[in-house]
Structures are given as C-alpha cells and as structure tokens.
Amino acid sequence: MDPKYQRVALNDGHFMPVLGFGTYAPPEVPRNRVVEVTKLAIEAGFRHIDSAYLYNNEEQVGLAIRSKIADGSVKREDIFYTSKLWCTFFRPQLVQPALESSLKKLQLDYVDLYLIHFPMALKPGETPLPKDENGKVMFDTVDLCAIWEAMEKCKDAGLAKSIGVSNFNRRQLEMILNNPGLKYKPVCNQVECHPYLNQSKLLDFCKSKDIVLVAHSALGTQRHKLWVDQNSPALLEDPVLCALAKKHKRSPALIALRYQLQRGVVVLAKSYNEQRIRENVQVFEFQLTSEDMKVLDDLNRNFRYVVMDFLVDHPDYPFSDEY
C-alpha cells in the first residue's frame, strides 16, 4: 500500500488516514482559492480533509472533493472528511440540524468524522461569536454529555461515520467517558500539538482509552491575529528544529509533522502554498532516530498558540487544567 495512505484504526472500527490536510484559512484568503488548494491536496495524495462550520469554507471544500470524485481521481470512500459542531449549536435539538446544514453545503451524504469543536457553549444563533453591548462574548451553559448524546444520534442516523471531540482536556473527556448512558466513545480528541506543546500527558491518557490524538496547529499555526499573539515564537524557525531539518535534508515543517507520526499522533498539515502541500506528503519518506525524538521532546515548553483568551472566563474553558 502506498505509504501516503497509512491509516489508524479508530475505536469504532473505522480507519483514519494519519496525515490530514487542514483547510482553515483567514477570511482574507479568497474562497475560490480554497477549492484550488483542496484539489491540489487531493492530487498530492492527501486523503484526510479537515474542515469545520466555523471555517466558512465547506461549500468550497465540498466542491473540490466532488470534482476529484467526478474526474475519477478518488472515490468518496477514499476520502476521510471531518467537520465540526460550532459552540453556538450546543443544544441537543440543534446538533443534527447543524450537521445537516454542513452536509448541504458540502453536497455530501455523510461526513467521516464529526467533532465537538470546543467544549464551551456560546449563546445559540447564527453569529459564531455572539457579543453583548459591551463587546463581551456571550456564554451559554450546557451539559456536554447531553450534546454528546445528540452526536451519538448523528452517528446512528448515518450522517457521521465516526464522532469525536476537539480541544477537550482530560477532565472533560472523562466526563463523556463516564456518562452512564454512553453509547459510543469519542474516536479522537483533536488538540493543538507541536514540539512546543507536545501534550505528552494528554496523549498517554488518550492512548489508555483507545482515543486517537489528532494534532492541529502542528506547524505552529498561521498566526492569525484573532486567535494568536503576534509576539509568539515562530516554531518553524526554532534552531533545534532547523538543525534536524538540515541533518535529514528536509524542511523544518516535515520534521515537525514526522515527530507526531512517530508518537502515534494523527497530524494535520495546513498550507495554502502549492509547493509545501506537495512537500508535506514526503513525511512518509524518512524516519527520525530515537535521539532525534528525544531532542524534539525536550523542546516542549507547554506553549500554546491558540489560547482563546476572550473565552478564558468561560466555566468550561479547557486550557486552565494541566492537561
């Protein structure tokens, strides 16, 4: 089998490609560019495509996937597509309609994976970040287990093959896992993960529960000003990472991606640059030594790019716990 298509078994019997293409782009990127780069990613060998309601690009991503199916490049079952439930739809009765709305935009019959995007409920409605007259984001309170049960119904209805969570800490995962009515465990927890924030404790916990850890922001984020402090360190310029890149004659990005794969983490590579999209698939063409891995482990400084500081007062804010 082509190494590009390596997959990991999920706890529900489905399989997820270990390398994914992240489709998020800042609003200033023209939406038609989303179609082009998603097609490019599929042509380069990506079979796992990650998007979300919040990214406001599902129409374009769906168009790209359908055009690659139509031209015979791939079949629908070759593509593993992820969407995410946004925080303004955290009412049990809103969950399935939110997924159906994504499917309508995508013009697909099902998603391979549907995730709870963040564990924090916001005031229900169509505005992604609802604010009061003082400009403060409006929170909502909700039982996450009730939302999980609504996710389970989406799986039973065949609208999502697998269901999981994103940006959950250990305590929040345990709450779902210990829910007396639990029907399906989350198959994964998608979190920020890179050499500066290697999530080793959360990774060990997830492995112990047969939950896959998926790394977003694996290259240190696109540093979009809404989400990321502009003074934060640039991961891909790290001297240790660059030295390893030189040693292996690869880019620093490839070292960061390979690091995750060798830890058993599914990794999302986000790029809108044609050359880098093609390059990122080369992650299967080399290996890091155990010494390399140790050096990369030592870069950990528990540094988080996506802090969501405007939600820090939310009762379910996930990043105050150690992990």
Curated annotation (Swiss-Prot):
The gene is AKR1C4. NADP(+) binds at residues 20-24, 50, 166-167, 190, 216-221, 270-280. This is Aldo-keto reductase family 1 member C4. The keyword Oxidoreductase applies. It is found in: Cytoplasm, Cytosol. GO terms for cellular component: cytosol. Its main location: cytoplasm. It is an enzyme of class 1 (oxidoreductase). It catalyses: chlordecone alcohol + NADP(+) = chlordecone + NADPH + H(+); a 3alpha-hydroxysteroid + NADP(+) = a 3-oxosteroid + NADPH + H(+); a 3alpha-hydroxysteroid + NAD(+) = a 3-oxosteroid + NADH + H(+); 5alpha-androstane-3alpha,17beta-diol + NADP(+) = 17beta-hydroxy-5alpha-androstan-3-one + NADPH + H(+). The record marks K84 as: Lowers pKa of active site Tyr. Cytosolic aldo-keto reductase that catalyzes the NADH and NADPH-dependent reduction of ketosteroids to hydroxysteroids. Liver specific enzyme that acts as an NAD(P)(H)-dependent 3-, 17- and 20-ketosteroid reductase on the steroid nucleus and side chain. Displays the ability to catalyze both oxidation and reduction in vitro, but most probably acts as a reductase in vivo since the oxidase activity measured in vitro is inhibited by physiological concentration of NADPH. Acts preferentially as a 3-alpha-hydroxysteroid dehydrogenase (HSD) with a subsidiary 3-beta-HSD activity. One of its GO terms (biological process) is lipid metabolic process. Gene3D superfamilies: NADP-dependent oxidoreductase domain. Disulfide bonds: none annotated. CDD domains: AKR_AKR1C1-35. The record marks L54 as: Important for substrate specificity. Keywords: Cytoplasm, Lipid metabolism, NADP, Oxidoreductase. Its EC number is 1.1.1.-, 1.1.1.209, 1.1.1.210, 1.1.1.51. Monomer. The active site is at Y55.
